[in-house]
Design a protein with these regions (language model features):
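An intracellular "coupling" helix at the cytosolic face of ABC transporter transmembrane type-1 domains
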Residues: 15, 19-22, 111, 122-134, ...
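Transmembrane helices of ABC transporter permease
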Residues: 65-72, 140-190, 263-274, 291
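Juxtamembrane loop-to-helix connectors within ABC transporter transmembrane domains
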Residues: 46, 105-150
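Cytosolic ends of transmembrane helices, especially the final helix of ABC transmembrane type-1 domains
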Residues: 88, 194, 217, 241, ...
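ABC ATPase nucleotide-binding domain helical subdomain, centered on the C-loop/LSGGQ "ABC signature"
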Residues: 428-469, 514, 518, 561, ...
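Membrane-integrated ABC transporters
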Residues: 1-40, 55, 59-64, 83, ...
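Helix-to-loop junction immediately C-terminal to a conserved catalytic motif
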Residues: 384
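Transmembrane helix-loop-helix hairpins at lipid-water interfaces of multipass membrane proteins
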Residues: 25-82, 86, 156-161, 272-276
Length: 583
């Protein structure tokens, strides 16, 4: 399976974040050099004890060597602890540098794909996979790996035969690592993909739990989720079987190799070609030389997860480049000018809005009507900047939407979607769009404009009522009003409402009309996607869409009159046809 090419822009961005910790990586490298040099303490102590202390029977020499070893091992422990702590800080810094960028990119990706929560969670999981690898002992094993030749060279210095045994053993472990990577890569990748699909399915079923219970679908949904989960588990078990098999082999082979080294050393001692101390020291040095390889084999799943996460992050960051540094623009007037607009929904090849043009002046409201599938919601998502423009332009105050900073644009536009989602937090937090420093006066004014103020005060804790605890007791109309209040916060230039009265009663519809009149009176513009005639009572203009195109546009009453006349002419023609025998 060939790995697809990694986009250059995203990879460069990741490498820059990694390079920001270059000095810390350099420190880890220096400390790793010190640790590996101090690792020679044990073998050299063994060599001196067997070859000098036992031969001379000198307690003073043994005491001096032992005190030196205690000091050197203490220093090794301090240095090893330092490099472990440094890698943890490198991992934390890497996360700090990229988490905001990844979060924003994943949100934009989710807005395009229609699933913000899943895209955001996936991007942050990939970043977490890379962070776990950077802070893991596996990374330290990579730093230790270049020092393996030093220990092998020391073994060769004792005797070439011992060096050959150690080299052959090392080559076998390296081949084991490469084979492990090749054979476990596909199952681990498939397991990750299948697990993600099962998790997305579980999240969807959780969110739709009320419908599932009401329609008696619990058994069916469990069966479908369990099938997806079983597939993920099957791939995970397959990958674990392969990886664990190589891990067990490498561990067992390393133990065997130590015995083989002792046997070869004993043979050379019998031939009086090496000393007993050299036999023991060479066995320890070989174990130290092969330890990083064995650690890489055992932690290969972590390496694979980090590599896959790195690749996915590179693609995500390439698809969603960072925001440009834009010149701040003054607050625009509500002059909305849409010219020859075409929009292609994400994941599709055909435009569902084609060549639509219209214009609004400050203080005007426009209704958009048409049958289901006419492109009303697509138009709404393009107007708020959530979906990109394929052709044509959308201008607000003379500037296209992409000339505004996204966060600034969000404060200039109020949006009420068909399905209102309230976030974890208080009602005030939701109305203030989760702002860290909300304006309480504007929150209350927005709620009053949406006729939600008294309704909120009637809740257990008023504006401080937490949505996560009470969302099950909020009706669709209450959620709709809170969503409308959020759309009116802080003071939008353009208000886009998609089926705003779908969950409102007569009182709520009247409150909606009052909110529309308020926005118009303040010089704003309002665009309403509607099915019900009551939703366009406050509209001066009317846009009729059919199959993604503009069928009619103009003053509301004139457009409605023309539609009635056209309908009457069609009916008259049909009746005349039937009278003449035409079928």
């Amino acid at each position: 399976m060939t790995r697809p090419p990694i986009p250059a822009d995203g990879a460069k961005e990741l490498r820059r974040a990694r390079a920001a910790g270059f000095n810390l990586f350099l420190a880890v490298g220096l400390f790793s050099a010190a640790v590996n040099l101090l690792m020679l303490t044990g073998p050299l102590f063994m060599l001196q004890v067997y070859d000098r202390v036992l031969a001379s029977r000198s307690v003073e020499t043994l005491t001096a060597l032992f005190l030196l070893v205690v000091f050197l091992f203490l220093m090794m422990g301090v240095v090893d602890l330092a490099r472990n702590r440094i890698t943890q800080r490198i991992a934390a810094r890497f996360m700090d540098q990229l988490e905001g960028r990844v979060f924003t990119a994943a949100l934009r990706e989710g807005a395009v794909s229609g699933n913000e929560a899943m895209a955001t969670a996936s991007g942050l999981r990939d970043l977490d996979s890379v962070q776990r690898f950077i802070g893991s002992p596996v990374l330290l094993a990579i730093f230790d790996l270049p020092w393996a030749p030093l220990f092998l060279a020391a073994v060769y210095m004792f005797h070439p035969l011992l060096g050959v045994v150690a080299t052959i053993g090392g080559l076998i472990l390296i081949v084991t690592t490469i084979t492990n990577r090749m054979m476990s890569k596909a199952p681990l990748q498939n397991a990750s993909i299948a697990a993600g699909q099962a998790q997305r399915m579980a999240d969807l079923y959780r969110d739709e739990g009320e419908v599932i219970s009401a329609l008696g679908m619990r058994g069916a949904t469990y069966t479908r989720w369990r099938k997806a989960r079983n597939e993920a588990q099957e791939q995970a078990v397959k990958g674990a079987d392969v990886s664990s098999g190589f891990t067990v082999f490498s561990r067992s082979f390393r133990l065997f190799l130590q015995s083989a080294m002792l046997a070869a050393g004993a043979y050379l001692v019998l031939r009086q070609e090496v000393t007993p101390g050299a036999m023991i020291a060479s066995s320890i040095m070989m174990g130290r030389a092969l330890a990083p390889v064995e650690q890489l084999v055992g932690g290969w799943a972590l390496v694979q997860a980090a590599q896959d996460g790195w690749d996915r992050l590179a693609r995500l960051l390439s698809r969603q480049p960072p925001d440009r540094d834009l010149t701040p623009l003054p607050r625009p007037q509500a002059h909305i000018d849409v010219r020859q607009l075409s929009v292609i929904p994400p994941g599709q090849n055909a435009a569902t809005v084609r060549g639509v043009s219209f214009a609004l002046a400050p203080g005007q409201a426009m209704g958009v009507i048409g049958p289901s599938g006419a492109g009303k919601t697509t138009l709404a998502r393009a107007l708020i900047g959530a979906w990109p423009v394929a052709a044509g332009s959308i201008r607000m105050g003379g500037a296209t939407l992409d000339q505004f900073n996204p966060d600034v644009l969000g404060n200039l536009i109020g949006y009420l979607p068909q399905q209102v989602t309230l976030f974890d937090g208080t009602i005030a937090d939701n109305i203030a769009r989760l702002s860290p420093e909300p304006d309480p006066d504007r929150v209350v004014r927005a709620a009053q404009a949406a006729a939600a103020h008294q309704m909120i005060l009637d809740l257990p804790n008023g504006y401080d009522t937490r949505i996560s605890q009470t969302s099950g007791r909020l009706s669709g109309g209450q959620i709709q009003r809170i969503g409308l209040a959020r759309a009116l916060y802080p003071d939008p230039v353009l208000l886009v409402l998609d089926e705003p009265n779908s969950n409102l009663d007569n009182q709520g519809s009247e409150a909606l009309n009052q909110a529309i009149r308020r926005v118009k009176a303040q010089g704003g513009a309002v665009i309403i996607m509607a099915h019900r005639p009551a939703a366009i009572n406050e509209c001066e203009l009317l846009l009729v869409m059919e199959q993604g195109m503009r069928r009619a546009f103009g003053p509301r009453d004139q457009v409605l009159k023309e539609m009635v006349q056209n309908s009457a002419q069609i009916l008259k023609s049909q009746e005349a046809g039937r009278a003449g025998g035409v079928t």
